[in-house]
């Protein structure tokens, strides 16, 4: 029986044959006759040799299988916001998609300690909300607020794997210190944000990744306000850059037509915009949803109130090391 194999540019032929003494000869001949190797072994040695080869092949096969399983079944990591209301919001998104289960009495301040079922063995990493896009490369998934996703160049509609509905429970609000709700400057800013111009801008600019929640649209102005008395005055408002700062620029143009200046102060965190309103440095802010504000007031003894909901930013699950949910669902296979 003969076999051929190629090594480099030389074609080899090898064959087994029995000698007159009953030994098995393994003969390898180079096609160019430059080499000839003859290995002789008796039947017992041949059998022992073949068993070793088979055992080695089985061992290699098992090792590769284990490596494959290890890669497939590795721990899944999901990064979530570390502030209480947004962490709860992220966990509720996972629960609504059957990935985890929370305690029955879990509220909008639920944390990972309220998880009662974690069938896929997910490891959670609690990260400051604004930093979540920067952690995508280090985790399998991250749950990110739309404003931070947009700022990082992500499209919440096309890039998210899971996304909230457009309900207004987490609508972003215009907020002021308690006692300033009827301030004419505040009412003028609210009317501008409730305008058809702002809604049209949101619809066109964000294509569903930010959704207006205003039901009673205005022309940009409040008929109860004496705008002439507000001429040459300045409204200060704290916000996050995207989308709040962009939306406020539309309101700025509306107010400018009445000779009112809107001074927009942008911040990249969730703390300062509230502290500057509380201490009176800034008149209003526009960056947060009501559950976050209520929790902030409770924990910081502040007195900030909502004067109106403007838009909602659906929170989404984004892929880091993963591009779909297969890694999660494959855990139980």
Question: Predicted regions span which residues?
Answer:
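Short helix-initiation/N-cap motifs at beta->coil->alpha
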Residues: 106-134, 264-275
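Beta->alpha turn/N-cap motifs
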Residues: 128-129, 137-140, 144-150, 241-242, ...
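Ligand-binding clefts/hinges and TM-proximal coupling segments of bilobed small-molecule sensing domains
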Residues: 89, 103-110, 187-228, 333
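Periplasmic-binding protein-like
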Residues: 150-190, 215-223, 307-319
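A conserved helix-loop-strand patch within extracytoplasmic ligand-binding domains
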Residues: 72-87, 91-93, 187, 195-200, ...
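Short, well-ordered beta-strand elements
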Residues: 74-79, 230-242, 260-266, 333
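C-terminal motif of bacterial Sec signal peptides marking the signal peptidase cleavage site
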Residues: 65-68
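Extracytoplasmic "Venus flytrap"
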Residues: 83-87, 229-251, 270-272
């Amino acid at each position: 029986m003969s076999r051929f194999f190629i090594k480099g540019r030389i074609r080899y032929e090898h064959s087994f044959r029995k000698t007159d003494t009953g030994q098995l000869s393994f003969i390898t001949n180079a096609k160019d006759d430059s080499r000839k190797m003859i290995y002789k072994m008796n039947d017992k040695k041949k059998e022992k040799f073949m068993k070793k080869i088979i055992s080695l092949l089985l061992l290699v096969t098992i090792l590769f299988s284990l490596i494959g399983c290890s890669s497939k079944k590795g721990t899944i990591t999901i990064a979530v916001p570390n502030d209480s209301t947004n962490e709860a919001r992220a966990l509720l998104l996972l629960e609504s998609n059957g990935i985890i289960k929370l305690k029955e009495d879990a509220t909008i301040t639920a944390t990972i300690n309220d998880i009662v079922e974690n069938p896929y063995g997910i490891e959670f990493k609690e990260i400051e909300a604004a930093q979540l896009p920067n952690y995508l490369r280090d985790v399998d998934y991250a749950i990110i607020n739309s404003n931070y996703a947009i700022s990082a160049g992500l499209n919440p509609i096309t890039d998210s794997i899971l996304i909230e509905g457009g309900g207004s429970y987490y609508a972003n609000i215009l907020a002021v210190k308690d006692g300033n709700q009827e301030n004419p400057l505040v009412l003028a800013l609210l009317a501008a944000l409730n305008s058809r111009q702002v809604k049209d801008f949101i619809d066109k600019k964000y294509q569903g990744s930010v959704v207006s929640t205003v039901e009673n649209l205005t022309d940009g102005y409040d008929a109860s306000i004496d705008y002439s008395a507000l001429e040459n005055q300045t409204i200060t408002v704290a916000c996050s850059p995207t989308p709040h700062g962009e939306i406020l620029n539309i309101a700025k143009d509306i107010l400018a037509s009445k000779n009112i200046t809107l001074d927009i102060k942008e911040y990249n965190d969730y703390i300062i915009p509230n502290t500057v309103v509380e201490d009176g440095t800034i008149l209003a802010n526009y960056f947060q949803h009501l559950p976050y504000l209520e929790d902030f007031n409770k924990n910081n003894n502040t007195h900030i109130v909502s004067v109106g909901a403007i838009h909602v930013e659906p929170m989404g699950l984004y892929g880091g090391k993963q591009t779909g949910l297969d890694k999660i669902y494959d855990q139980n296979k």
